Amino acid sequence: REKEELNVSSETVESLSSNEPDSSSEESITHINKEKSQKFKHEGQQQREVEHQDKISRFVQPQPVVYPYAEPVPYAVVPQNILVLAQPPIVPFLQPEIMEVSQAKETILPKRKVMPFLKSPIVPFSERQILNPTNGENLRLPVHLIQPFMHQVPQSLLQTLMLPSQPVLSPPQSKVAPFPQPVVPYPQRDTPVQAFLLYQDPQLGLTGEFDPATQPIVPVHNPVIV
């Protein structure tokens, strides 16, 4: 290509030199030579740049784009065509040391056997007895001992209480000695009612102790017959 351009330029120079005078031909030749030299330099620079870019593109490989805020995938991506095999459940095995400790606990602390509850015999309705304070056959306790507690026992309990068929044991007597009663040295005639109350049995108070009679002692005057 360069050779062809040189030939064309030489032909043009010859034609100009033949047609024009020598002075003008020399100027035109110099001008043409300058233009050719500039074109040649420019083309050489372009070729060098293209070759340099080709060399750089061969050595430099494309790198993947890295995102600074991208988080890694926490699990493995399984393709859709692959079936996941179901794993059998893992059963934990007890170590021999743990088995020995459990056996030692069983020997030290044996399990208690639960005793069955015995069913109590059911008393038929015909044999039930209703507690009646006025009935002397069903009531084994004296009336004057139960009267202080009658206002504390509700009526529903009095109707549901059952007396056993066995004889009721008498309540233990307290060790407190009764109040000494005055002894009359001689027989009396026409004893008034107030003096007769002194000889009654002591009453049981709410505290469970024997209390003496609350009536004051009244002197007894017997009429003297002359």
UniProtKB/Swiss-Prot annotation:
There are at least three different forms found in milk, with varying degrees of phosphorylation. These include form 5-P which is phosphorylated at three sites, this form is present in low amounts, form 6-P which is phosphorylated at six sites, and form 7-P which is phosphorylated at seven sites. InterPro entries: Casein, Casein_beta. The modification Phosphoserine is found at S9, S15, S17, S18, S25. Keywords: Milk protein, Phosphoprotein, Secreted. It comes from the Eukaryota. Coiled coil: none annotated. GO terms for cellular component: extracellular space. It is found in: Secreted. The modification Phosphothreonine is found at T12. The keyword Secreted applies. Transmembrane segments: none annotated. Residues 28-51 have a biased composition (Basic and acidic residues). Mammary gland specific. Secreted in milk. Residues 1-51 are annotated as: Disordered. Important role in determination of the surface properties of the casein micelles. Belongs to the beta-casein family. PANTHER family: BETA CASEIN, BETA-CASEIN. This is Beta-casein. It comes from Equus asinus.
